[in-house]
Amino acid sequence: DASEAIALNPYIYILYDLRAISRIRQEDYAGAIADYNKAIAISPDTRNYWFNRAICMLNSKDYDDALAQTDSIIRKWQRFANAYQLKAEVWLNKKDTVEAAKWLDKSLEIDPYDASTWTIRANMSLARKQWADADKELGKAIHLKPKETGNYVNRALARLNINNLRGAMADYDMAIDLEPNNFLAHYNRGLLRVQLGDDNRAIDDFDYVIKMEPQNFMAIFNRGTLKEKTGNLRGPIHDYPKVIEQFPNLWTALSYRA
């Protein structure tokens, strides 16, 4: 293995990289950092070793070391957009969204075609409830990488909050096309269909959620309410007791069952 090869020839830097990757898989970040230290000492201009070492520092929550490392990378490779993005991620872990936004913007100035950076930027906008910004940023991420299911689900949330219901529905549909078992997309689409008065198709979505998560009592409650609304009284008589058993003080379910 890599350790045996290193013992035979300790000056082949790629062996340290291979062992570091193995250690990362085992979440031995300290060991991986030690290997990258040796690899960098032998090959100081291999950018990925610097970058991977910084990621290990982030994963081991050595945030100050990770910031210092990203600073070193940026000094050596000023046009390396991923280093700016990584620096932003460190600031996010330090709960400083202002600094994080600044470094994400710098990353996007260098490489405006990186979908993951747009996704991180959009997630920050969602957290701040800047819905219109999140909609635009997720649009860019989706344009660049159109098969990321989570981006459609998140953009649907942004669009709901700017009253673009048609756009939100299209995003939920696309998320489910890409990932048919995504129960969150099914659940949220069910809620949106209720809002749009499409009760029968909403029931279909809640049926799917309950099939995937039999103990999802909110989906059970919503399905019972909709079945009652559509005239199927046997449905709520079946669904409401399950909810009441779990939440005996939920007066809404008690009154609806009555």
Language-model regions, residue ranges each:
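Alpha-helical tetratricopeptide repeat
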Residues: 1-258
